Amino acid sequence: LVIRRLTSSKTQLLGLRPSILHGLLILLLVISFSVLTFALALRWIISDNIPLSNGYESMLSVAWFSMLITIVMAFAMRSLRLLIITFGFLLSGFFLLVSHIGQMDPAIGHIMPVLNSPLLSIHVSIIMMSYALLALTFICGLTALILSALQRMRGCLQTGLEQSTALMTLSRIFLYPAMTTLGLGIFIGAIWANISWGNYWSWDPKETWALITFMVYAVLLHLQSVPALRTPKYYHIYTTIAFLTIVITYFGVNYVLGGMHSYA
């Protein structure tokens, strides 16, 4: 939908004016967000714990944060509304799909006593928000690369560059709060670990990969020191590849590497 809208000179799409299409998409997103909020609230009430105790609930939470960020950004940046809304649908839909794969257990159970801490709930919530924001930078990068390839095939190099630059700007808008929340989430997690386990950092696989993820994305905050990343093309390639660190941090650690965080 986004690619067709950005590469077509027509003002209408699917026979609808842009304003009507945007309104319908926002309405659908708000309805989806409300249903997911209701579902998470029910799990919270039934279990008497914030729904972040296992992989299934954390995926639902990432989808919830993706929808929330999308709704806020859609109203804040009207000129990019279609792009932002579509990204939100793609991300939240992907996370909801992943939550229903065979490895995820949707059963509501009792939380481990050591995990029943307000600090842990804050830590996981902030980390999930950062993952949602960084996933949006990944979608920006992937979309920019696809659009650039399409415009190159059509011989519209200048148009492709303009679109890539706009997506780079949007990606950096997501990047700064993502890095802030990721750093804050790791910091709060270290405090909770010291209270629960007696040490701030134990080089557990997830701790190590969370630090690697933070360092990989921190490179994007220093564009003045890395001239190549000032170019939209290389910036988007970097953000697309960098997302693999999040995939390893979440899925690789949980289902392959193990460790104390394998329950999360």
State where each predicted segment sits.
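Hydrophobic cores of alpha-helical transmembrane segments in multi-pass integral membrane proteins
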Residues: 1-8, 22-49, 53-108, 122-149, ...
